[in-house]
Structures are given as C-alpha cells and as structure tokens.
C-alpha cells in the first residue's frame, strides 16, 4: 500500500472505516495474546475464526453493490475461473520454492528463521499482492486495491492464525517476544496511519505512502 500510494495518490471511494478498525482491533488482540500468554491457542483460534465468519457475513450483506454487476456469458465466467485456479497453482509452487530457498539462506548466512520469515519470505509472498495492486491502480480500480490490501491482512491475521492455532498451539519463545511486539506495534501504527488518512482526507497521499515505506525500511533495518 505504501509503495502504491508513493507512486499514485489513492482515493478511498468506499467506506472502509469499519474494515480498518476491525483489522486494527484484532491485530491488537493478537499482540496482547503474544505479550501476556506467549501463545495463540485453541480458544484464541475460535475467537479469530468466529470474527472472520462475522466479518464475511457483514461483507456479503453490507458491501454488495448491484450497480457493479455486469452481464457475462458462461464461457467468459468459466475462463476466468480457470485462469484464477491456474494462477493459484503457480503461486503455490512459487511459495514453496520461496520457503525452501529462504531456509537455505538462513542457514548459510546464520540469520534466524524468524527474521528471514519476516523479511524475504514475507516480501516474496507479498509480490502477487503488489502486482495486483499496481494493476488495479493502472485501471483506476482503487476499491479493488484497498480490498486486496485489507483482505490479505484479514486472511493472514485472522483466518491463517485461527486455523493454525486450531491444529496446534502457536507458541512464542521468550527470545522472540521483543521482535514479535515490535512487529505488532509496526502493524498497528501502519493501520492507524491508514485510519487517520481515511477520516481526515478520504485518500492516501504520496507523503503518507512515503511514511509507510520509511516504516518498512526501518523495520527491515531493525531485523538485521
């Protein structure tokens, strides 16, 4: 989002205040779980997945826009689904390659897997989102860009953590706590910037995009 805003001024064309508040509050909840309990367990997973279900229900019932519906024949619909499935398959293969090679880099460089995950793996798995966002901007589809960014954060924090914690407890080692808290604070600060820009300006300026980029660069610097 910061990189895209630095290139183009992004206008908030839809009401995303509730969405931003939702993800910020749940991100803060995860941060509290890590700080006080050093774990995200089965109980937390149920809360996260229940929140995801409620959000999905809200999304369907209150964010639907019949004006955006277009007439499409069945062939074009099938073609679109096939392209999406093939793209997801390619992403799955690419993600596995990123993880495997990132682990090799961590061993060769003597860098912790946690820091490699926060940097190389996170950047690699975010590239599809970046390209999707840039394509959305070129087409003037700012709503798609905002939905992509907010939706990916919601899936990563709420759905992925929720499902993972149902399978096994996600424990945070004491030596990782400082990094975990730092990342949580960076996350909340970034979303607060988005919230303030939406409330006061209904847009994300190039200057705000630059601030987000500086925060990310500072984050990477602190990791290494």
Regions found by a protein language model. Give the residues of each.
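Hydrophobic alpha-helical segments, chiefly the membrane-spanning helices
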Residues: 1-224
């Amino acid at each position: 989002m910061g990189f895209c805003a630095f290139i183009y001024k992004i206008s908030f064309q839809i009401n995303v205040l509730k969405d931003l508040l939702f993800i910020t509050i749940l991100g803060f909840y995860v941060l509290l779980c890590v700080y006080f309990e050093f774990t995200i367990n089965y109980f937390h997973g149920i809360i996260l997945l229940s929140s995801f279900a409620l959000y999905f229900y809200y999304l369907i019932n209150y964010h639907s826009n019949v004006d955006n519906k277009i007439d499409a024949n069945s062939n074009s619909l099938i073609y679109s689904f096939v392209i999406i499935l093939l793209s997801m398959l390619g992403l799955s293969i690419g993600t596995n390659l990123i993880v495997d090679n990132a682990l090799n880099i961590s061993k060769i460089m003597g860098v912790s897997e946690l820091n490699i995950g926060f940097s190389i793996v996170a950047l690699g798995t975010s590239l599809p989102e970046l390209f999707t966002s840039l394509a959305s901007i070129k087409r003037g589809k700012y709503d798609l860009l905002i939905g992509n960014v907010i939706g990916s954060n919601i899936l990563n924090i709420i759905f992925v953590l929720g499902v993972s914690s149902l399978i096994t407890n996600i424990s945070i080692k004491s030596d990782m706590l400082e990094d975990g808290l730092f990342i949580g604070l960076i996350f909340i600060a970034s979303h607060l910037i988005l919230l303030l820009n939406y409330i006061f300006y209904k847009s994300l300026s190039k200057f705000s995009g630059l601030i987000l980029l500086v925060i990310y660069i500072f984050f990477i610097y602190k990791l290494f």
